[in-house]
Each structure stands twice: as structure tokens, then as C-alpha cells.
Swiss-Prot record:
Pfam families: Meth_synt_1 (PF08267), Meth_synt_2 (PF01717). Keywords: Amino-acid biosynthesis, Metal-binding, Methionine biosynthesis, Methyltransferase, Repeat, Transferase, Zinc. Belongs to the vitamin-B12 independent methionine synthase family. It comes from Salmonella newport (strain SL254). This is 5-methyltetrahydropteroyltriglutamate--homocysteine methyltransferase. 5-methyltetrahydropteroyltri-L-glutamate binds at R17, E18, L19, K20, K117, R515, C516, W561, E605. Catalyzes the transfer of a methyl group from 5-methyltetrahydrofolate to homocysteine resulting in methionine formation. The lineage of its organism: Bacteria, Pseudomonadati, Pseudomonadota, Gammaproteobacteria, Enterobacterales. GO terms for biological process: methionine biosynthetic process; methylation.
Length: 754
């Protein structure tokens, strides 16, 4: 039984973010649909060939998406809401873009579908919408077309499909309430049709992703798998694919299914390989997810070999990435500025394909010399002086309960803050960033490339900050921000100023749609060598009599949106960051900044996938935030911001953060998220986002007023703030001015209506 390699998916965006550039050019009307489609074809062909050359035996097809693979599945099934449909009922790529972003080059704008995080990753998916009695049919044949492309190129392939039960699990009911699981019988015929078409093309294996099987699912959902897969069986071999956690708790459900193989994540799961082998049907193939698809670290292949070698010859075996390589940058070889030692510790998507090939060859031959050679750098890292800082470790060990307590409770602090700031009812503010214009990006790029000296760079940034203050005063906002012109990314910026991080030139990963991020990498103990944000916050405050918020990214978010170390716990990393940023809060306060926002949009997304593991995570996550914030005096108002959140199941922890003001993303959910705060009787102040910054559509005054009135039915008006859902970095100035003007007008109308 020869062992084969495969990946669960590959990055879509291209080494130079070619897909992003093509999407945005098309959306702006600067290129044709045909040009966009051509870029997609070119990227797919390149990525298949690169994986093949790196040693992958079975190439994934269907992992490419124009916006998001869950959205692609919605179109495949004909699940398009009335507001997004073409007038003639057809489905095309503009339909897809209208669902994802609210508008497209053709068709009428409409509210975008909700977006949320893909399990506990930094990738976002577009939430499917379900209505009672809806019909499904095959309307989008992208998968079949791409299979034809790959076969025409002579590749040995494995199509990828998001499974029907997970697809339903990821969606939400719109309109009349009903159990969306009842739609399973209606979508299965479409899946049967697709599998039949794949069988006609001579496809042997289909990777059918059911990551919901790693969750603690309700029994009704677990029971749904057997009839679903009974209906899908028989046309092709099915590789039931799971990731992000182990499958052992749901293994009884899995082994009853009529599939021919199982993929398990052996990085993030705690499954015992020997137990899996013992319990799986003898004729099943086991796909072992041994190479981490979610990080940038080189694998110790000697450990991976030892983990799986006992199964060689005992059952059909493939070796694979733990999950799709979507979550990893593409190619380490183009990184020319990384220190040689540090670079030797890393492996990006293509290098991970190479790791799989090395592992396959060793398992097939029994020869391990190549594994030992590959693993030597990552083994040597354990003793590197770049990794350990005795002062940081000592400070971390000395943390006491007092370090995470504000001086007085919220009620006392709120009085001091009201006396200091004298804000009106319905105070208006923004979340932090303003549009990152071509001029701002060019300024930063010229400075990084050495084409601009420090003095001219600072002069340029200062001018953009000044303009941001002028714009906000002109609009009539109550609490201002400096606009973050100096920041490329809310995590990368802090990582650049903290010891213990390194950065890549081209380590881009997709966040959503055309948005890509370049996460920093935590390589060692973290400390702050000097103040980070104080200079620009102090300058911005000098330009206005209104309060200007200091803007920090919180410790859990920096952790979650970075590639973390693998040799210490996530708790250790978060608390090291918290101690570093605690010093930043103290310095901002000393510089006269009275409102400090510590963004924690990632707090919820960092939750373990199994609810039984939540308490331990939330305990240290909340403690890290409080360590960061607790140094502030009573009269200093601490804000936090969160997005993409369902709060009802973590309200105790949200309240335990003890932030004076929390701003949250609520507009896409029509203020539904406030139900959690109402039910909990949340005691502090709240800024529910009143418009969706991910869409270029400008909300009307009436729309915003209606949302705020809804909010006031749940939260006392005296504790409500008025703000957008999120930062405005990705928007243009014309739509930003128009939206904020309407937001301020809505707040003024409500003040006058008192």
C-alpha cells in the first residue's frame, strides 16, 4: 500500500496578491469580467503545477473561490436571497459579489450577507441564509468547470466539496423561524447531481469537508449524518474530511457512515493514531493531517514519522496538511530579508508540500536521513538566544491578582469620566482607522524602501493625521481618533514595535474577499523596548479640544492574528503582550490621553471549538485584557471593540473585562446581538455599530435612527454610543464622509427628540 500525499486546499490569492488586485480592478470598473476570469484560470493552473512539482500526488480542485468557498457552495446550491438575485433569475459572478459585499458592477446594490469567522481561524466566510420552504438546484458550475480545467492539464485530482451538514450548520434562518436542518433532504439532490457529474468525469476520490464533526453538536445534527451520507454513497469514493480539532468524541457517528476514508487533523486534535486505526473500518483509508496548515513553522519530521510509522502497511494511508493551506503564506523562498537562522525555522505552503513529500518518501522507504536533515534547524531553535528573555519570564512569574484590578468599580469611574469629558447624549465616535489612501500607502512604502527619510515621512504622516482631525471636527464627531495613517495593519504595527516578533515581505493570507493580511510571527519572549503610539496620539490631541482616543490592539487579538510560537502556551504569549501594552497605557495616560481603546475583536474567535474547553481560555483571555488595562486611573476611560461576535454565551467574560465602553459590530445582524447585553443586564456603556463598513453602501439617516431606536429598546439610551461597526481603513473618503455625516445627523436628531 503506497502512501500518497495531498493537501486539503491551497492559498488562492497568488504570491503577489494577483487575485486581490484583479477583484478590486473589476469592482472599480477598471477591467472586464473576462480579465478577472483569466486571472483566476492563471492562478489555478500555476498553483496546481506548483503543488505537483513540490511532491503532491493528489491535487485539490474546488478550493479556489472568487470571494469565499462557503459562498461558492451557496451559489452551487442555488441559495441566493431575493435581494441579491439577477432580474432574470440567472446566477453569475456579480451575484456572488452582491451577496459578499453588497454591490457589483452590474445589478442593484443590496445589503450584504452576514460575514463571520470560519471556525476559530482568521478567515471569514459569508453566512448562508435559509428560509422556510426554499428550493435548491444546481445553478453555479464553477467546481465542474475547474475539474475540467485540471483534467485538461493532465493532473491527478481530488475535487473538494463543503459537506451538506456543515453547510447547513454554518447558516442562519432569515424570516419565519424554523429548523434549518429540515432543509437537508432538499439540498441532498444537488449534492447527488454534483457527485454524478464528477463520476462521469472519471473522478475516483472526492474530499467532502465536514468540519462540524469536530464540534459538540446537538444529537439531532449528529443523527443527520447517516441518512445524508446514505444518500450520497456509491458514485465516487468519499474522503470525509475534518479539521481544527479531533474526532474521537464523535467517532461512533463517523464510523457508521458509508464513506471510504477519513481525514483527521493530528495537529490541533488530540486523537490517538493507534485508537483511530483500531476503531476505523479496516477498508477505510486514513488521511493523516500531520503538517500544520495554520502556521509558518518548519515541522520536526522525525516526530511526524514516529507518530504515524506504526500504521505503514496496516491500512491505506495518505499524509496531508492538517487543514487547507489557505491559512498559510505561499512561498518562503521569496523572503529575502529574513535573518538566515530565523528563516530556517519556517515553512510556507509550498515548503509544507515539500515536507509532505519528504514524509511520504521516508514512510514508503523506511529511510529517514532526509527527515533528520530537514528537522535539524527547528530542533536547534529550542536553544536559541533569540527565543528566551529572562527579564520577561521573571516579570510574568511575578503577576498578582492586584495587577488585573482597576482602582474602583465602573460606577465610580463613570462619574469621574462624565465630569472630565462632559459628552452629550448619544456621543458619536469612530472605531479607529480612517481610509488608507493611495497617498498614505505610498508614503509608508517609500519610507520602508528607503526612498523617503524619517523627517519627511513624519511630516507626511503628521499632515494626514491633521487632516483626519479636521475632517472629524467638520463632521461634528464628539470623540475623535487620529486615523492610524502610520499603521499598515492593527496587529503588524504593534508587532513591529515589540521585541519577540519578526515580519515577512510576502507572507500574505486571505482574511475575506479581497482583503489580505500579513501576520507577524512570534518567535520569542515579548517585550516593549520603547513607547509605540504615544507620539502620534499626543500630536493629534494637540490639534483639538475634543478628546482623542489612544488606540491599542489588545493582547488576545495580537496573539490570535499572529502566527504564534509552538513551544509555549497561548496564555503565556498573551500575558507577555499584556504586560508590554500595560506600559503603553501608562505612558498614554501620562501624555494626557484620557480615552484609551484596547481592541479585542478576536476574543471570541479564539475560543476552543469545544465548549467544554472554553472556561480555561476565557479565564486567561480576560485576565490578559485586565492586566493590559488595569493600570489606568478612574478618570481614564477604557474602551474595547469587538466584531463578528455572538455574545450570549460569553457575556460573563465580556462583563469581566470591565471596560468602561464596549463597541460592537451589530448592523448586519439588525441589532440582534444586543439581546445578549439586555438579557445579561450589561452594566457598562455600549456602542452598537450602526452601519456596515465592509460594504461601500452609504446608510441613510433614517436607517441609522431606526437602528439606534431599536438599540434603545434594549439598552438605556444614556449608556449608548453611536459608531460604525468597525474601522474605516478599507473604505474611500467620499463614502466615509457621507456615512459619518448621516451617523452624526441621526445622533443629533435623537438628542433633539428627547
Amino acid at each position: 500500500m503506497t502512501i500518497l500525499t495531498h493537501t486539503l486546499g491551497f492559498p488562492r490569492v497568488g504570491l503577489r496578491r494577483e487575485l486581490k488586485k484583479a477583484q478590486e480592478s473589476y469592482w472599480a470598473g477598471n477591467s472586464t469580467r473576462e480579465a478577472l476570469l483569466a486571472v483566476g484560470r492563471e492562478l489555478r493552473a500555476r498553483h496546481w503545477e506548483q503543488q505537483k512539482q513540490a511532491g503532491i500526488d493528489l491535487l485539490p480542485v474546488g478550493d479556489f473561490a472568487w470571494y469565499d468557498h462557503v459562498l461558492t457552495t451557496s451559489l452551487l446550491l442555488g441559495n441566493v436571497s431575493a435581494r441579491h438575485q439577477n432580474n432574470d433569475g440567472s446566477v453569475d459572478i456579480d451575484t456572488l459579489f452582491r451577496i459578499g459585499r453588497g454591490r457589483a458592477p452590474t445589478g442593484e446594490p443590496a445589503a450584504a450577507a452576514e460575514m463571520t469567522k470560519w471556525f476559530n481561524t482568521n478567515y471569514h466566510y459569508i453566512v448562508p441564509e435559509f428560509s422556510k420552504g426554499q428550493q435548491f438546484r444546481l445553478t453555479w458550475t464553477q467546481l465542474l468547470e475547474e475539474v475540467d480545467e485540471a483534467l485538461a492539464l493532465g493532473h491527478k485530482i481530488k475535487p473538494v466539496l463543503l459537506g451538506p451538514v456543515t453547510y447547513l450548520w454554518l447558516g442562519k434562518v432569515k424570516g419565519e423561524p424554523f429548523d434549518r436542518l429540515t432543509l437537508l433532504k432538499d439540498i441532498l439532490p444537488v449534492y447527488q447531481h454534483v457527485l454524478a457529474e464528477l463520476a462521469k468525469r472519471g473522478i475516483e476520490w472526492v474530499q467532502i469537508d465536514e468540519p462540524a464533526l469536530v464540534l459538540e453538536l446537538p444529537q439531532a445534527w449528529l443523527d443527520a449524518f447517516k441518512p445524508a451520507y446514505d444518500a450520497l454513497a456509491g458514485q465516487v469514493k468519499l474522503l470525509l474530511t475534518t479539521y481544527f480539532e479531533g474526532v474521537t468524541p464523535n467517532l461512533d457517528t463517523i464510523i457508521a457512515l458509508p464513506v471510504q476514508g477519513l481525514h483527521v487533523d493530528l495537529i490541533h486534535g488530540k486523537d490517538d493514531v493507534a485508537e483511530l486505526h483500531q476503531r476505523l473500518p479496516v477498508d477505510w483509508l486514513l488521511s493523516a493531517g500531520l503538517i500544520n496548515g495554520r502556521n509558518v513553522w518548519r515541522a520536526d519530521l522525525t516526530e511526524k514519522y514516529a507518530q504515524i510509522n506504526a500504521l505503514v502497511g496496516k491500512r491505506a494511508l495518505w499524509v496531508a496538511s492538517s487543514c487547507s493551506l489557505l491559512h498559510s503564506p505561499i512561498d518562503l523562498s521569496v523572503e529575502t530579508r529574513l535573518d538566515t537562522e530565523v528563516k530556517s525555522w519556517f515553512a510556507f505552503a509550498l515548503q509544507k508540500c515539500g515536507e509532505l513529500a519528504l514524509l511520504r518518501d521516508a514512510l514508503n522507504s523506511g529511510e529517514t536521513a532526509a527527515l533528520e536533515e530537514w528537522s535539524a534547524p527547528i530542533q536547534a531553535r529550542r536553544h536559541s538566544r533569540r527565543v528566551h528573555n529572562a527579564a520577561v519570564e521573571k516579570r510574568l512569574a511575578a503577576i498578582t491578582a492586584q495587577d488585573s484590578q482597576r482602582e474602583n468599580p465602573y460606577e465610580v469611574r463613570a462619574e469621574a469620566q462624565r465630569a472630565r469629558f462632559k459628552l452629550p447624549a448619544w456621543p458619536t465616535t469612530t472605531i479607529g482607522s480612517f481610509p488608507q489612501t493611495t497617498e498614505i500607502r505610498g508614503l509608508r512604502l517609500d519610507f520602508k524602501k528607503g526612498n523617503l527619510d524619517a523627517n519627511n515621512y513624519h511630516t507626511g504622516i503628521a499632515e494626514h493625521i491633521k487632516q483626519a482631525i479636521i475632517e472629524q471636527e467638520r463632521l461634528g464627531l464628539d470623540v475623535l481618533v487620529h486615523g492610524e495613517a502610520e499603521r499598515n495593519d492593527m496587529v503588524e504595527y504593534f508587532g513591529e514595535h515589540l521585541d519577540g516578533f519578526v515580519f515577512t515581505q510576502n507572507g500574505w493570507v486571505q482574511s475575506y474577499g479581497s482583503r489580505c493580511v500579513k501576520p507577524p510571527v512570534v518567535i520569542g519572549d515579548i517585550s516593549r523596548p520603547a513607547p509605540i503610539t504615544v507620539e502620534w496620539a499626543k500630536y493629534a490631541q494637540s490639534l483639538t479640544d475634543k478628546p482623542v482616543k489612544g488606540m491599542l490592539t489588545g493582547p488576545v487579538t495580537i496573539l490570535c492574528w499572529s502566527f504564534p510560537r509552538e513551544d509555549v502556551t497561548r496564555e503565556t504569549i498573551a500575558k507577555q503582550i499584556a504586560l508590554a501594552l500595560r506600559d503603553e497605557v501608562a505612558d498614554l495616560e501620562a501624555a494626557g490621553i484620557g480615552i484609551i481603546q484596547i481592541d479585542e475583536p478576536a476574543l471570541r474567535e479564539g475560543l476552543p471549538l469545544r465548549r467544554s474547553d472554553w472556561d480555561a481560555y476565557l479565564e486567561w483571555g480576560v485576565e490578559a485584557f485586565r492586566i493590559n488595562a488595569a493600570v489606568a486611573k478612574d478618570e481614564t476611560q477604557i474602551h474595547t471593540h469587538m466584531c463578528y461576535c455572538e455574545f450570549n454565551d460569553i457575556m460573563d467574560s465580556i462583563a469581566a473585562l470591565d471596560a468602561d465602553v464596549i463597541t460592537i459590530e451589530t448592523s448586519r445582524s439588525d441589532m440582534e446581538l444586543l439581546e445578549s447585553f439586555e438579557a445579561f443586564d450589561y452594566p457598562n456603556e455600549i456602542g452598537p455599530g450602526v452601519y456596515d463598513i465592509h460594504s461601500p453602501n452609504v446608510p441613510s439617516v433614517e436607517w441609522i435612527e431606526a437602528l439606534l431606536k431599536k438599540a434603545a429598546q434594549r439598552i438605556p439610551a444614556q449608556r449608548l454610543w453611536v459608531n460604525p461597526d468597525c474601522g474605516l481603513k478599507t473604505r474611500g473618503w467620499p463614502e466615509t464622509r457621507a456615512a459619518l455625516a448621516n451617523m452624526v445627523k441621526a445622533a443629533h436628531n435623537l438628542r433633539q427628540a428627547k
